[in-house]
Amino acid sequence: MAFPQELAIVIQKEMEKLDLKQVKIISDNITNKYRNESGKNRSLINKEIEALVYSAVRMPATYEAVSSVLDQTKKLYSKECKSLLDVGAGTGAATWAACNYFNIEKIVCLEKEAAMEKIGRKYMREGHRAIQQAE
């Protein structure tokens, strides 16, 4: 399923405020952190600007990966999902994807990185009612 237009627009607006060289440096740093520090119980995204860059660089691919899984799940699982618990929600890619596949009424997002949670909540204000009301 295609990346939501309203989400792409809000990410683009946020990214327009940033310097392209700075985005490249931050993107490279994020990639290195994920390659070298994942699974070591370290904070990988500490600053809001890192969460913004993460959302522009990685969120669309995460959204597509989750969408692919949900597409297969929906084919195999006939029941309608009404609630979602998104553990490690990041900036909300899985939440957005799930809401495009199921009629989600209640969402709880858990994210340990404050910067990721802040950006995710900002983006969720652009979503439909259940996304806007996510806890």
Stretches found by the model and what they are:
Residues 128-135:
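Conserved SAM-binding strand-loop segment of SAM-dependent methyltransferases
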Residues 80-90:
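Conserved class I S-adenosyl-L-methionine
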Residues 60-80:
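Conserved alpha-helix/loop element of class I SAM-dependent methyltransferases that forms part
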Residues 120-121:
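Conserved SAM-binding loop
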Residues 42, 47-66:
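Class I SAM-dependent methyltransferase Rossmann-like catalytic core
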Residues 91-104:
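Conserved SAM-binding loop of SAM-dependent methyltransferases across substrates and taxa
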Residues 1-40:
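N-terminal auxiliary segments of SAM/dcSAM-dependent transferases
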Residues 113:
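Conserved SAM/SAH-binding beta-strand->alpha-helix loop
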